[in-house]
Amino acid sequence: MTLSLVLFLIGILGFILNRKNIILMIISIEIMLLAVTLLVLVSSYQFDDIMGQTYSIYIIAIAGAESAIGLGILVAYYRLRGNISLRT
């Protein structure tokens, strides 16, 4: 559980400190989602419950869809502006 908390805090710090680069913001959000998934899996294992493992599969699927949508928006943003920096 400590590992998932550390990963979540790294994701929050990465999101806050890298406000200029969209790719690093998306990666930070993914780290936060995977930290939550790890916490759900560990809790599911400790309580001997299969629903947590099923829920973690849904979280991973949503994280993949979120990454695909975010990268699609990033490509459109690059075509419109010519760079991916937020502050220009």
Curated annotation (Swiss-Prot):
Q: Where in the cell is it found?
A: Mitochondrion membrane
> Which reaction equations make up its catalytic activity?
a ubiquinone + NADH + 5 H(+)(in) = a ubiquinol + NAD(+) + 4 H(+)(out)
User: What InterPro entries does its record include?
Assistant: NADH_UbQ_OxRdtase_chain4L/K, NUOK/Mnh_C1-like
Q: Tell me its family.
A: Belongs to the complex I subunit 4L family.
Bilayer disposition of the protein: Multi-pass membrane protein
Respond yes or no to whether keyword Iron-sulfur is given for this record: no
E.C. no: 7.1.1.2
User: What sort of enzyme, by top EC class, is this?
Assistant: translocase
* Segments passing through the bilayer: 22-42, 57-77
Give GO terms for biological process.
ATP synthesis coupled electron transport
User: Function, please?
Assistant: Core subunit of the mitochondrial membrane respiratory chain NADH dehydrogenase (Complex I) that is believed to belong to the minimal assembly required for catalysis. Complex I functions in the transfer of electrons from NADH to the respiratory chain. The immediate electron acceptor for the enzyme is believed to be ubiquinone.
Keywords of the record? Electron transport, Membrane, Mitochondrion, NAD, Respiratory chain, Translocase, Transmembrane, Transmembrane helix, Transport, Ubiquinone
Q: Which organism is it from?
A: Trimorphomyces papilionaceus (Jelly fungus)
A single Gene Ontology CC annotation of this entry is: NADH dehydrogenase complex
Quote the protein name from its UniProt record: NADH-ubiquinone oxidoreductase chain 4L
One example GO MF annotation: NADH dehydrogenase (ubiquinone) activity
